[in-house]
From Swiss-Prot:
The name this protein goes by in its record: Methionine import ATP-binding protein MetN 3
Top-level taxonomic group: Bacteria
GO CC field: plasma membrane
Keywords: Amino-acid transport, ATP-binding, Cell membrane, Membrane, Nucleotide-binding, Translocase, Transport
Subunit structure: The complex is composed of two ATP-binding proteins (MetN), two transmembrane proteins (MetI) and a solute-binding protein (MetQ).
All copies of domain ABC transporter, residue ranges: 2-241
UniProt function note: Part of the ABC transporter complex MetNIQ involved in methionine import. Responsible for energy coupling to the transport system.
Enzymatic reactions: L-methionine(out) + ATP + H2O = L-methionine(in) + ADP + phosphate + H(+); D-methionine(out) + ATP + H2O = D-methionine(in) + ADP + phosphate + H(+)
Gene3D superfamilies from the UniProt entry: 3.30.70.260, P-loop containing nucleotide triphosphate hydrolases
Protein's organism: Oceanobacillus iheyensis (strain DSM 14371 / CIP 107618 / JCM 11309 / KCTC 3954 / HTE831)
Membrane topology type: Peripheral membrane protein
PANTHER family per record: AMINO ACID IMPORT ATP-BINDING PROTEIN, METHIONINE IMPORT ATP-BINDING PROTEIN METN
Length: 341
């Protein structure tokens, strides 16, 4: 478990003090894939560097498995760092070493015997799908293959925590998907806690269990990914979600809808089992009201279904209000577009 307890990190730039992280309190449970998302300058990278004391808190403390990391001796901190793997956006591979040599490096640094190094490197090459690339050099590899080497190297010392600093930002969408699947495998098969930072909500959506949203050094929202996606409370979180999920039809479609005499539009959110229940049809039929699905989708998120539909209703206005009132007891519904503007 990683715990940030009221952590603040202040940098002094000339005569000016800058608070990169402000009073952050977070708990990352053992086995979590925990994502921290924010725009540039939000404080994500600084927060990450506090875990292994590459940066030390100005105030507050960071605890790993109940131990205040900031109070460890130099020797104890070195030992703790061996149990924290890191992967980076730009891979940080040694160009003069082979793939096998890069993976072996942290083991040799730790004084591991040659036979153990050879065996461990072979295991890791197989785990990341690069057994045929052992003797290649980084400049012979694709971006995705380089990141696989980075992951294997980070796993070499059998860490219990893996820190990922924008690990997919330099990759194309298909390669990003492959690397995220590999990280999921690392978490699932090896039981490693993963703490990642990103500015891409698609990464959070794909593999994270929980998420914290940062802005201006503060955590402005955090919780499990399903709840954050289906009921965001902060405008910045909503902006990130809109980057992967269009909430409303385009302006062109809305204009055509208005010109065609379409009525008010409502967003109806279905979660879990409700996403497959015939709630709309049964409720509208009961009140002799028509409904039209204008836009939306039903998809899977954290192994649960989530429906986001934009609908209109037709019929007696009083009965429409009865339908809306009944739906409010079962699902989330709100008016999102008024025909009158």
């Amino acid at each position: 478990m990683i715990e940030f307890q009221n952590v603040t990190k202040t940098f002094t730039l000339g005569k000016r003090k800058v608070e990169a992280v402000k009073e952050v309190s977070l708990t990352i449970e053992k086995g979590d894939i925990y994502g921290i998302i924010g725009f540039s300058g939000a404080g994500k990278s600084t927060l990450l560097r506090l875990v292994n004391m590459l940066e030390r808190p100005t105030e507050g403390s960071v605890h790993i498995q109940g131990t205040d990391v900031g109070k460890l001796s130099a020797k104890q901190l070195r030992e703790r760092r061996r149990n924290i793997g890191m992967i980076f956006q730009n891979f940080n591979l040694f160009q003069s070493r082979t793939v096998a040599g890069n993976i072996a490096y942290p083991l040799k640094l730790a004084g591991t015997s040659k036979s153990v190094v050879t065996k461990r490197v072979s295991e890791l090459l197989q785990f990341v799908g690069l057994s045929d690339k052992a003797k290649d050099y980084p400049d012979q590899l694709s971006g995705g293959q380089k990141q696989r080497v980075g992951i294997a190297r980070a796993l070499a010392t059998s860490p219990d925590i893996l820190i990922c600093d924008e690990a997919t930002s330099a990759l194309d969408p298909n390669t990003t998907s492959d690397i995220l699947k590999l990280l999921k495998k690392v978490n699932r098969d090896l039981g490693i806690t993963i703490l990642l930072i990103t500015h891409e909500m698609g990464v959070i959506q794909s593999i994270c269990d929980k998420v914290a949203v940062m802005e201006d050094g503060k955590v402005i929202e955090n919780g499990n990914v399903f709840d954050t996606f289906t009921k965001p409370s902060h405008e910045t979180t909503k902006r990130f979600i809109r980057s992967v999920q269009q909430e409303l039809p385009s302006e062109k479609v809305l204009k055509e809808w208005t010109e065609a005499g379409g009525g008010n539009l409502y967003r109806v959110l279905f979660k879990g089992e409700r996403a497959t229940d015939p709630i709309l049809s049964s409720t509208t039929r009961k009140h002799n009201i028509d409904f039209n699905i204008v836009y939306g989708s039903v998809r899977e998120l954290q192994e649960k279904l989530f429906g986001n539909l934009i609908v209109s209703f037709g019929g007696d206005e009083q009965q429409i209000q009865h339908v809306i009132q009944e739906l409010e007891l079962i699902v989330d519904i709100e008016e999102v577009y008024s025909h009158g503007g």
